[in-house]
């Protein structure tokens, strides 16, 4: 079976002239000669990027998905290829509704007419992984509730595993034969896609993502997220609250309904930066197909988020990296940008900060020929990542995913309001983050988090130091790396504790002095 699939892939490559694209990048002389023979006498009207998109479409939904994921790696691909792959649509004909009903009944352990008052047999949406039916719940406290039922396609795993095995083989050969193979790391890209695809095959994971996002925005008048019904959800079936709205792309319809379009554009950016800098958890598939706007009088003009299969998570370190880079960029402090890359630990130790600074200046300085409101933060990140790649900087996958999402959000915002000033909207979030991290509040919050661990580990520090000294005396060259790392970790924790105690003590002391002055002023001593 795999051999036939492989033959089809080879013929597709030749049919769309992708061997011509490969020819210029292949190093092996024999393979290069073979490719020259296959390209004799052929002419193609479409550019290579378009031919790649069409080839992936002809190979089926799994390769379409791969192209979509590949389009997010703008740090690896030329701009024209990334833009063309972003046009790939994950739309396939629906599977038989009788099969969908059978999957629901098997997964939930009851007949469809016992579970639902109504179940629309014609799906409202169909993609490569699942399709969606509208229904109404029949039982319990949610009786009569309108829901959307997402059903996983049957027998997907064998197809996916077969195609992934071929992709791994192709990636291995590409890494050996292609001039850019090592730099582009095709095996890592396929491994990333493997994880992403298998995550999508578990609808409980998507439900958990949606539930987290809903909880994060509870009480904020910004974003509506459907409620997940856990009693009706399994890895193969997801039942969530049905929400209806107007697709964000239908701007004329929204304007005619009375929606404030410039406000909508600003709030879209606010939602994104709230997810990034407050929550460290963001919806990473915010294209127009997954975003609607409510016209319900109760929630008029609010965003509705759908499809939670792809999310990103950021650590405090990631958020600090982003905030400081953006602030340094807009101050044109390229030395600081270069230093931040070195401090991240993702740069080879022999990298010269002056060379990195010069390269960053060369790609960033041209942005300042335009107004601040016209600068794309996503493009800035993309250029920084591309420059970093030349210095063998290992850009973290979550930051690449964030950059792709940021481009989507910017495109969405500017399609609504071409005058949208992204920097004006983003700057307060960046400055608030830095204030909270560096200021007294940040120290206090970190002290609360770390205090229990410190109280447990601090008493062990003298023993660890003693052990290290004894070991060094008995075998000067035999101190284990693990022990050294452990000592350094404890030392850093101790330093943080002492710093926090110092700040806390200064704050208490300052408070006491101020209180004393107020008493003197009020009562005359």
Curated annotation (Swiss-Prot):
Which one Pfam family would you cite for this protein?
A: ABC1
Provide any one GO MF term from the record.
protein kinase activity
- Active-site residues, record numbering mapped to chain: 285
Against CDD domains, the record matches this protein to:
UbiB
Major subcellular site: membrane
Which residues participate in ATP binding?
124-132, 150
Q: In which pathway does it act?
A: Cofactor biosynthesis; ubiquinone biosynthesis [regulation]
UniProt GO BP:
regulation of ubiquinone biosynthetic process; ubiquinone biosynthetic process
* Its membrane topology: Single-pass membrane protein
Q: What positions does the domain Protein kinase occupy?
A: 118-500
Per UniProt, subcellular location reads as:
Cell inner membrane
Q: Tell me, in a sentence or two, what this protein's role is.
A: Is probably a protein kinase regulator of UbiI activity which is involved in aerobic coenzyme Q (ubiquinone) biosynthesis.
Q: Which PANTHER family match?
A: CHAPERONE-ACTIVITY OF BC1 COMPLEX CABC1 -RELATED (PTHR10566), PROTEIN ACTIVITY OF BC1 COMPLEX KINASE 7, CHLOROPLASTIC (PTHR10566:SF113)
What is the protein named? Probable protein kinase UbiB
Organism of origin is Burkholderia mallei (strain ATCC 23344)
The primary gene name is ubiB
